[in-house]
Amino acid sequence: MSEDLSMKCGLEIHVQVDTNSKLFCQCPTNYKDVEPNTNICPVCIGHPGAKPMPPNKKAIDMAIMVAKMLGCEMVIDKDIYFQRKHYNYPDLPSGYQKTSVPIGEHGKFLGVGITEVHLEEDPGQYKPDLGTVDYNRSGTPLIEIVTDPDMKSPEEAREFLRQLLRLFRYIGNLRGEGTMRADTNISIKYNGIQGNRVEVKNVNSIRGVYKVLKYELIRQKNVLRRGGEIKLETRAFMESQMITKGMRSKETADDYRYIPDPDLQPIVLNNEWVEKVEAQMPETPMNKEKRFVEQYGIKEDDAKVLVSDLELADVFEKVVAELGNDKDGISLAVTWIRNELKRVLVYNKLEFFETNLRPEHMVELINSIKDKTISQKIGKTIIEQMVEHKGEKTPKELINEMGLTVIEDTSELEKACEEAIKNSEKAIEDYKSGNQRALNSVVGQVMKLTRGRAEPATVVEILKKKIDG
């Protein structure tokens, strides 16, 4: 019997704004590299009578920018007030979290509806296994993005988050996946039976969200298949086991006892404020991708790879400009940045900014290949060494250090070709019988003998002269 299974998923994504001070006080937002409970004050640890400052202007601007880039309608000329969201947990010393009503609503990103974008404060960090709480993080500004339940598979949700994080990198001033947390909401329909919505809280990676959704899809299907009922509940993600575990019944808005915060004046956005923020908005990844195809005449796949990393895209444009902005320069830049540099970055699990390479390094490398100072094979070795040395050595320094310039002495090349011919009797016979490809293995022998320092086209020319007479 065939199974009829479908799922709906919505996400609540929390991303930290990279500000110097917290949302409602002047405490620094650095909480990773300091002693516990040092970057705190009466406001961020909820002392009775401590009055919050007006919300951090940069955090509001970033929330506006995120909302606009997600296609939201801005809440203009209306009170945007902060509410107290009440719940009891050790990481929330005041007993409530300050969270704004929506700043932007009804957006769309990659076909997924954006319900709302709003600001809130991050709670502290509670470690139940140790029984300790660090309040350094308490009060750090968070932007929360709430999606409609439009994602139909774990794979869709994973791709949505990947593209959203790419957008965050383009926007800047957001702290990305290392601090991103997502609450996942999933419900399934199995053979006509609709299950209740289940929320899994505080999943802190794209991989985690994917694993949660895969696990919940199977778990809920098995419950319904056995005639059980899916509870409307909140569950926790047990990352070490890659499973979810029931925490409590699902809360409603009434459970949080939302009330406007009497200590904070409402924010009122106007068109002038929003337009100022819009003027600072960067080009979106999707627009950059389209522009690369149109402006540089490169393939869509190449543009997609280049644009996937903002720094890589910037390097590409700078290198193309240095190489003359012509067809040959663009082709070389694509080959050595999109293909070779990206290959080395992926292998080493690095982003471009982590390598300390500069655009001029890539220009110097490509020019060394263009003027035949080094072969393409050696170029691949040099790019690997450039990344390994974290940009401390230029391509020319590495080429000279390693003695990797192209062999220009014809007699040296002829000697290597003669040795390769001597060791490749079968390949020579096949070549003489009409198999042109057989010569490739002989060329490979020469490249090996010369440590890649021979120019392949020159090697082929010498080999043909010697074999064909």
From Swiss-Prot:
Annotated coiled-coil segments of the chain: none
Physiological role: Allows the formation of correctly charged Asn-tRNA(Asn) or Gln-tRNA(Gln) through the transamidation of misacylated Asp-tRNA(Asn) or Glu-tRNA(Gln) in organisms which lack either or both of asparaginyl-tRNA or glutaminyl-tRNA synthetases. The reaction takes place in the presence of glutamine and ATP through an activated phospho-Asp-tRNA(Asn) or phospho-Glu-tRNA(Gln).
EC number: 6.3.5.-
Catalytic activity: L-glutamyl-tRNA(Gln) + L-glutamine + ATP + H2O = L-glutaminyl-tRNA(Gln) + L-glutamate + ADP + phosphate + H(+); L-aspartyl-tRNA(Asn) + L-glutamine + ATP + H2O = L-asparaginyl-tRNA(Asn) + L-glutamate + ADP + phosphate + 2 H(+)
PANTHER family the record matches: GLUTAMYL-TRNA GLN AMIDOTRANSFERASE SUBUNIT B MITOCHONDRIAL AND PROKARYOTIC PET112-RELATED (PTHR11659), GLUTAMYL-TRNA(GLN) AMIDOTRANSFERASE SUBUNIT B, MITOCHONDRIAL (PTHR11659:SF0)
Record-given protein name: Aspartyl/glutamyl-tRNA(Asn/Gln) amidotransferase subunit B
GO molecular function, one term: asparaginyl-tRNA synthase (glutamine-hydrolyzing) activity
Family: Belongs to the GatB/GatE family. GatB subfamily.
Entries under InterPro entries matching the protein: Asn/Gln-tRNA_amidoTrfase_suB/E, Asn/Gln-tRNA_Trfase_suB/E_cat, Asn/Gln_amidotransferase, Asn/Gln_tRNA_amidoTrase-B-like, GatB, GatB_C_1, GatB_Yqey_C_2, Gln-tRNA_amidoTrfase_suB_CS
